[in-house]
From Swiss-Prot:
Biased composition regions of type Polar residues, renumbered to the chain: 780-791
Reactions catalysed: Na(+)(in) = Na(+)(out); K(+)(in) = K(+)(out)
Alphabetical keyword list: cAMP, cAMP-binding, Cell membrane, Glycoprotein, Ion channel, Ion transport, Ligand-gated ion channel, Membrane, Nucleotide-binding, Potassium, Potassium channel, Potassium transport, Sodium, Sodium channel, Sodium transport, Transmembrane, Transmembrane helix, Transport, Voltage-gated channel
Gene3D superfamilies registered for this protein in UniProt: 1.10.287.70, Helix hairpin bin, Jelly Rolls
Protein name: Potassium/sodium hyperpolarization-activated cyclic nucleotide-gated channel 1
Intramembrane segments: 334-355
Changes seen on gene knockout: Deficient mice are viable and do not display an overt phenotype. However, these animals are defective in the learning of fast motor tasks due to a malfunctioning of cerebellar Purkinje cells. Mice lacking HCN1 developp severe sinus bradycardia and reduced cardiac output.
Consequence recorded when altering C303S: Abolishes conductivity
Annotated transmembrane regions: 132-153, 163-183, 205-225, 250-270, 285-307, 361-381
Gene (UniProt): Hcn1
Ranges per topology, Extracellular: 154-162, 226-249, 308-333, 356-360
Post-translational modification: N-glycosylated.
Pfam families in the record: cNMP_binding, Ion_trans, Ion_trans_N
Record field: compositional bias (Pro residues): 875-885
Length: 910
């Protein structure tokens, strides 16, 4: 250095981060022989350089340059260290899908890598990348050896060709290396699933297991063959002794086929890898392994079929000599031998010719045994594979077979069997899963993710879920249960106790109420929440119009979820109040709670906006149907489901003016009443329209179901629709038919009451004497009185006489006064009640003429007699004024002294 340099400094040195020299280290470099160390000019003790400063002088110049770069000095060593690290890492388990599944986490894999480093030199981990690729190479080499070696030994006489020698020498070398590497490869302890990396334990385990088989299969037969060939002359080699040696080497080469054990082990390891990663790939690999093993055995059997005659020098009775194939090409010989072997193994024949010699016979039997075993294994594995590929469909088929046996055992009708079949098709769609058990085995996040995915269409179509908290939606969906309903099924019924609410995923359902309006619910709608909120009964019926796929929520789960989310409870309550208002109903519990929330200020502006949107969307989703043109829907709960065709025809007849409603006040009134008609009141056309258009009266009769008779007069007032009157000829014809039926019934009853005729004759004689005494005073009025007296007395004593018609579902018996009033013609459409002529007998006296008894038309439905013999009174019509005192004294039995006469009584089946 010129002018003296600082110690510990190097002039013109490059500061690249790697020029760090150890203290007191001699300067070395590749150019040290061509350059010499220099000192500063006029050097002295003070001008000496520090030992760590490496400088040199170039001839002919005073400049200084470094003696050599550290990178040049450490390059080979650094490259060797990199290769060593890479090779060492290949002996360790890598971080991949297989190792993560084996050890659980990346941290556990790193710990296993540290174990391999501390285990010793050249210890190979069984799950390392190096062992993976080595096993792949060995798999290919073994398949090649097991296919090529039998063909070469059997069909090729020249064993000294260069390709054959190269192939055999390379194979023997690779298998010897594999034998050595097995002593340095860790093993898996089957009891504890721990990887054993101790070299001594690995060696002992290998010596006790597969070492002998692997050593015999790895004997270098080709090396021995080459040594024997070089030690013999060509003339001696061709002698018979040499040919025997060659045959021995051929037989010895068959020991390589023991490498099949290695092939099976490696294939089993690959099956485990595929099984742990892909289940379907594992099944496919298993079936392909089975097919490949069968083909390999067929290949070996074909070579064996030709090798045995070859070792016997083709005797005359062998199959090769009989078919004259000794001098044919090896391809033709192999084809015939393979065909013969497959015929034996599949048990379909003997090939081209049946065996003749004893050796061919034994080989054929051996082939049949091996073939039958392989065929059974193949069928079993194939069956198991097919069943495992679609186990859910197989379970569905087994389940439906049980259902069919159940239907046959109980002898269910064909239409019911078809409904059950359709239900299973729509409910399970050909596959059965134990979904509840599957989801219960998963953790909560994964279960919630699956439920959200399965119900994504329901969430997308429901405005309630769209505006709700995601946690509420997840909690609600996790408690839903899937259900399917068929067209015509009543999902809920009005008046029933509600235990579930429903969400519609797919389908259309109709809401049926007592009013004439029906509403439709489609995808994304929900119903049944009102009774869950109020703990009451169903307010309407819901019927499935199409196949409906629903999700149900029980009342316990409903309350459990809403306790954690009070805002959503208020949303349900608001929608419930709006729905009740739309169908004309109210619920005091919901209204009081809603008013209480308003007074306490629970609702804020944001919540109000959300509730408005929910109610708005709920109204938009409900499809309202226009009012139905027939009024039967107004009495939906009043009519029986077993209505006869006659009663259905009656509901479409013109309005009927019943005699029970004709009181004295009505007869004397100048105009019909304009008030809301009562269930059994007389209706004019205008008042009838008012009754149909107005909501029905909530009376006991309006909610009563009559099971045995036709609709009563109160029901007809709600159900019948004004139409044009029937022609008089049809009315007369109907009356004639009714009269004939009554006469037949009267004759039958007369035969049954022969025992009572004597008592009736005595009563008639007494009545005739009274008539003779009263005839001058009131002519023509005594007979009706007596008849009325007889009929009412019989009804009061609950005894039916011949004067009273028998009670039946189609022809109820009535007092003669009522039948006489009904026999009058009906008023026209525009005629008022004042124009009806008043019956004289009804005004002046309580009796009627004896000859005025008429029949009741078939299209008229009247009250039936009760078990007590009285007619049910009408609560909607004011009672008639009492008759005169004279009439009361003469016929006291006409009056009804029963204190319960004003209570409503319904028809009963006698």
């Amino acid at each position: 250095m010129e002018g003296g340099g600082k110690p510990n400094s190097a002039s013109n040195s490059r500061d690249d981060g790697n020029s760090v020299f150890p203290s007191k280290a001699p300067a070395t470099g590749p150019v040290a022989a061509d350059k010499r160390l220099g000192t500063p000019p006029g050097g002295g003790a003070a001008g000496k350089e520090h030992g760590n400063s490496v400088c040199f002088k170039v001839d002919g110049g005073g400049g200084e340059e470094p003696a050599g770069s550290f990178e040049d000095a450490e390059g080979p060593r650094r490259q060797y260290g990199f290769m060593q690290r890479q090779f060492t890492s290949m002996l360790q388990p890598g971080v991949n899908k297989f190792s993560l599944r084996m050890f659980g986490s990346q941290k556990a894999v790193e710990k296993e890598q540290e174990r391999v480093k501390t285990a010793g030199f050249w210890i190979i981990h069984p799950y390392s990348d190096f062992r993976f690729y080595w096993d792949l190479i060995m798999l290919i080499m073994m398949v090649g050896n097991l296919v090529i070696i039998p063909v070469g030994i059997t069909f090729f006489t020249e064993q000294t060709t260069t390709p054959w020698i190269i192939f055999n020498v390379a194979s023997d070398t690779v298998f010897l290396l594999d034998l050595i590497m097995n002593f340095r490869t860790g093993t898996v302890n089957e009891d504890s699933s721990e990887i054993i990396l101790d070299p001594k334990v690995i060696k002992m385990n290998y010596l006790k297991s597969w070492f002998v088989v692997d050593f015999i299969s790895s004997i270098p037969v080709d090396y021995i063959f080459l040594i024997v060939e070089k030690g013999m002359d060509s003339e001696v080699y061709k002698t018979a002794r040499a040919l025997r040696i060659v045959r021995f080497t051929k037989i010895l080469s068959l020991l390589r086929l023991l490498r099949l054990s290695r092939l099976i082990r490696y294939i089993h390891q690959w099956e485990e890898i595929f099984h742990m990663t892909y289940d379907l790939a594992s099944a496919v690999v298993r079936i392909f392994n089975l097919i490949g093993m069968m083909l390999l055995l067929c290949h070996w059997d074909g070579c064996l079929q030709f090798l045995v005659p070859l070792l016997q020098d083709f005797p005359p009775d062998c199959w090769v000599s009989l078919n004259e194939m000794v001098n044919d090409s090896w391809g033709k010989q192999y084809s015939y031998a393979l065909f013969k072997a497959m015929s034996h193994m599949l048990c379909i024949g003997y090939g081209a010719q049946a065996p003749v010699s004893m050796s061919d016979l034994w080989i054929t039997m051996l082939s049949m045994i091996v073939g039958a075993t392989c065929y059974a294994m193949f069928v079993g594995h194939a069956t198991a594979l097919i069943q495992s590929l679609d186990s859910s469909r197989r379970q569905y088929q087994e389940k439906y077979k049980q259902v069919e046996q159940y239907m046959s055992f109980h002898k269910l009708p064909a239409d019911m069997r078809q409904k059950i079949h359709d239900y299973y098709e729509h409910r399970y769609q050909g596959k059965i899963f134990d979904e509840e058990n599957i989801l219960s085995e998963l953790n909560d996040p994964l279960r919630e993710e699956i439920v959200n995915f399965n119900c994504r269409k329901l969430v997308a179509t429901m405005p309630l879920f769209a505006n709700a908290d995601p946690n509420f939606v997840t909690a609600m969906l996790s408690k839903l249960r899937f259900e399917v309903f068929q067209p015509g099924d009543y999902i809920i019924r009005e008046g029933a106790v509600g235990k579930k609410m429903y969400f519609i995923q797919h389908g259309v359902a109709g809401v049926i109420t007592k009013s004439s309006k029906e509403m439709k619910l489609t995808d994304g709608s929900y119903f049944g929440e009102i009774c869950l909120l109020t703990k009451g009964r169903r307010t309407a019926s819901v019927r499935a119009d199409t196949y409906c796929r629903l999700y149900s929520l029980s009342v316990d789960n409903f309350n459990e979820v809403l306790e954690e989310y009070p805002m959503m409870r208020r949303a349900f309550e608001t929608v419930a109040i709006d729905r009740l208002d739309r169908i004309g109903k109210k619920n005091s519990i919901l209204l009081q709670k809603f008013q209480k929330d308003l007074n306490t200020g629970v609702f804020n502006n944001q919540e109000n906006e959300i509730l408005k949107q929910i109610v708005k969307h709920d109204r938009e989703m409900v499809q309202a149907i226009p009012p139905i043109n027939y009024p039967q829907m107004t009495a939906l709960n009043c009519t029986s489901s077993t209505t006869t065709p006659t009663s259905r025809m009656r509901t479409q007849s013109p309005p009927v003016y019943t005699a029970t409603s004709l009181s004295h006040s009505n007869l004397h009134s100048p105009s019909p009443s304009t008030q809301t008609p009562q269930p059994s009141a007389i209706l004019s056309p205008c008042s009838y329209t008012t009754a149909v258009c107005s909501p029905p009266i909530q009376s006991p009769l309006a909610t009563r179901t009559f099971h045995y008779a036709s609709p009563t007069a109160s029901q007809l007032s709600l159900m019948q629709q004004p139409q044009q009157q029937l022609p008089q000829s049809q009315v007369q014809q109907t009356q004639t038919q009714t009269q004939q039926q009554q006469q037949q019934q009267q004759q039958q009853q007369q035969q049954q009451q022969q025992q009572q005729q004597q008592q009736q004759q005595q009563q008639q004689q007494q009545q005739q004497q009274q008539q003779q005494q009263q005839q001058p005073q009131t002519p023509g009025s005594s007979t009706p009185k007596n008849e009325v007296h007889k009929s009412t007395q019989a009804l009061h004593n609950t005894n039916l006489t011949k004067e009273v018609r028998p009670l039946s579902a189609s022809q109820p018996s009535l007092p003669h006064e009522v039948s006489t009033l009904i026999s009058r013609p009906h008023p026209t459409v525009g005629e008022s009640l004042a124009s009806i002529p008043q019956p004289v007998a009804a005004v002046h006296s309580t009796g009627l003429q004896a000859g005025s008894r008429s029949t009741v038309p078939q299209r008229v439905t009247l009250f039936r007699q009760m078990s007590s013999g009285a007619i049910p009174p009408n609560r909607g019509v004011p009672p008639a004024p009492p008759p005169p005192a004279a009439v009361q004294r003469e016929s006291p039995s006409v009056l009804n002294t029963d204190p319960d006469a004003e209570k409503p009584r319904f028809a009963s089946n006698l």
